[in-house]
A protein has these predicted regions:
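Membrane-embedded translocation segments of transport machinery
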Residues: 198-206, 210-354, 361, 366-420
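N-terminal alpha-helical transmembrane segments of multi-pass membrane transport
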Residues: 2-144, 500-512
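Helix-loop-helix module between adjacent transmembrane segments
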Residues: 18-43, 76-78, 114-117, 157-225, ...
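Flexible loop linkers connecting adjacent transmembrane helices
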Residues: 11-19, 51-57, 84-102, 126-151, ...
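C-terminal membrane-solvent junction of multi-pass transporters and transport-like membrane proteins
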Residues: 20-30, 88-106, 295, 299, ...
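Hydrophobic alpha-helical segments of multi-pass membrane transport proteins
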Residues: 34, 67-83, 281-292, 370-380, ...
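Membrane-water interface regions at transmembrane-helix termini and the short interhelical loops
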Residues: 15-21, 45-60, 79-98, 149-156, ...
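Extracellular loop-to-transmembrane helix junctions
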Residues: 25-32, 59-75, 111, 146-177, ...
Length: 512
């Protein structure tokens, strides 16, 4: 493969007015316009908007779900094979790493997990325990088998494949292209097939806009759900009214934290918040294990992880029940795929000085393993309580959804008030970390060259908070619709990520 002619200075052909501001007004304007249009349509025509989104979601899942499953699986295997080649010793850039390994991995982990790191970790295993995944049919004979299958399915949705698409091959392509003068923007993922032409092509503009909208949808959704979930939790714990005013206060606090964090930059706010988040998660995980049952959690992890590895390929590409898949695996894979381009930009930016092997191991191996442990602690403890007292967790999930599972687990532990409060705090910090990191990546995607301005970073954080606050005014439907929209945007993003599968190994060889 002949390497495309590099563009030494992306600024060379940029219009002077755009360069002076550093802002790509076309990309920023179109992206903001689409977000505003979606919010306005949701408020003015909620039923029509919901029908359009649901139809688009169903079509995307039906026609592209299998493609996403195989794309994520192939990406993971290519990345792992690449990690064991001599080329993996190549560094992503010259100089020493900008962050310590702990800070670096913390930033990567907290950005992806968001609120799902708490609520889905507790709720998804329970959901699959109550209604076993169709992959297993009627083969699950005991409660232990059901628990292992429930955890294994959760690991499929949040495990190795989800992490591999976010920060491995795409980050390698972006880093290599950036060394040739390309910007840290989603369009750079097309560098392997378009070269420098993508800089000023309408295709590049479309790539940037689609990637930005996907991440906005995937971030505003958790922010809005956070308002609903924390408001519910506060009402359960303290009696504070679970109403729109409480939800707005929660969103305002989170948005303020994210805006301040992203304004202070990578070296201050973002990495400090990520590190604090990880320590709080470790403390809470230890508390749940000690106050619950360490023995049960350990056995649950071994059973779930063993089932996951033993059925890894089969579960990852399972096609037997399209309706069920669209609500679980395909939904999550589409969501993570939508995050792929901007996560690749973010990971590439914070991974300067790291080797390719470091990048792959610390993105596609360590975080997903830690995620399975985390899901085993929260979800496994919930399953244990459900086995001991049927309905104590499952009934709460079926009646009140995600936040009810976390609070019902906390309520059955000693020091329930303290543990429940820690869960809510951790959820806020998780979502705030995702919001600040993705605000940085969105701002970077709207910037022609160099670092995005502080004002632009903060503006995107505030804008996503405002969008979430407006959408929850019409209830769960507005936020759910936006989260479904990310699956629709995953259709073009899936093709945007495809060149990395073939180009990353070639670029790794050239970097070695």
């Amino acid at each position: 493969m002949t390497e495309p002619t590099p563009l030494t200075t992306p600024e060379a052909d940029a219009p002077p007015s755009a360069l002076a501001a550093g802002l790509d007004r076309k990309v920023a304007g179109i992206s903001i316009g689409i977000v505003v249009l979606f919010v306005a349509a949701s408020l003015g025509f909620p039923d029509w908007t919901a029908n359009v989104i649901n139809s688009g979601f169903s079509g995307a899942a039906k026609w592209f779900g299998a493609y996403w499953q195989y794309l994520l699986l192939i990406t993971f295997f290519v990345a792992i094979i690449l990690a064991f080649t001599p080329y993996a010793k190549a560094r992503l850039s010259t100089g020493k790493p900008e962050f310590t390994r702990f800070k670096w991995v913390s930033m990567i982990m907290c950005t992806l997990l968001a609120g799902g790191g708490v609520f889905w970790a507790a709720a998804e295993p329970i959901a699959h325990y109550i209604a076993s995944p169709p992959y297993y049919g009627d083969s699950l004979e005991s409660e232990s088998d059901q628990a292992s299958a429930a955890l294994a399915q959760s690991f499929v949705d949040w495990g190795f494949l989800a992490w591999a698409i976010l920060g491995t091959l795409g980050a390698i392509v972006i880093t290599h292209a950036h060394s040739k003068g390309m910007p840290l923007r989603p369009r750079t993922l097309l560098y392997p097939i378009m070269g420098k032409k993508v800089l000023h092509s309408w295709i590049g503009t479309v790539a940037d806009v689609v990637a930005i909208i996907a991440v906005v949808a995937g971030t505003v959704g958790p922010v809005g759900f956070l308002g609903l979930q924390v408001s519910y939790g506060l009402a359960e714990m303290t009696g504070i009214p679970n109403n729109y005013a409480t939800q707005l206060i929660v969103i305002a606090v989170l948005t303020g934290i994210a805006a301040l964090s992203v304004s202070s930059g990578l070296n201050k706010g973002i990495q400090i918040l990520s590190r604090a988040n990880v320590w709080l998660a470790i403390a809470l995980m230890a508390a749940v294990v000690v106050l619950g049952s360490a023995g049960y959690v350990f056995k649950a992890f071994l059973g779930g992880f063993g089932t996951y590895i033993g059925n890894f390929v089969g579960m990852s590409v399972y096609q037997g029940d399209p309706t069920w898949l669209s609500g679980w695996t395909v939904f999550f894979f589409g969501w993570f795929l939508g995050y792929g381009p901007l996560m690749a930009i973010f990971v590439a930016r914070i991974s300067r000085g790291r080797t390719i092997r470091d990048l792959i191991i610390c993105t596609a191996v360590i975080p997903p393993v830690l995620t399975t442990v985390w899901f085993s602690v929260l979800g496994g403890t919930g399953i244990m309580f459900e086995q001991q007292n049927p309905g104590s967790v499952g009934a709460a999930y079926e009646s009140d959804g995600l936040p009810a599972v976390v609070m019902s687990i906390a309520a059955q532990l000693p020091l329930s008030g303290l543990v429940g409060g820690a869960f809510l705090l951790l959820t806020v910090t998780f979502v705030a970390t995702t919001t600040d990191s993705m605000s940085y990546a969105i701002a970077q995607s709207c910037t022609i060259s160099g670092e995005p301005s502080t004002k632009l970073r903060a503006t995107w954080a505030v804008m996503m908070g405002v969008a979430a606050a407006v959408l929850i005014a019409i209830g769960d439907g507005g936020i759910s619709g936006l989260q479904s929209f990310i699956v629709i945007t995953a259709v073009p993003v899936g093709f945007l990520m495809l060149p990395s599968v073939f180009a990353a190994p070639i670029y790794a060889r050239r970097m070695a």
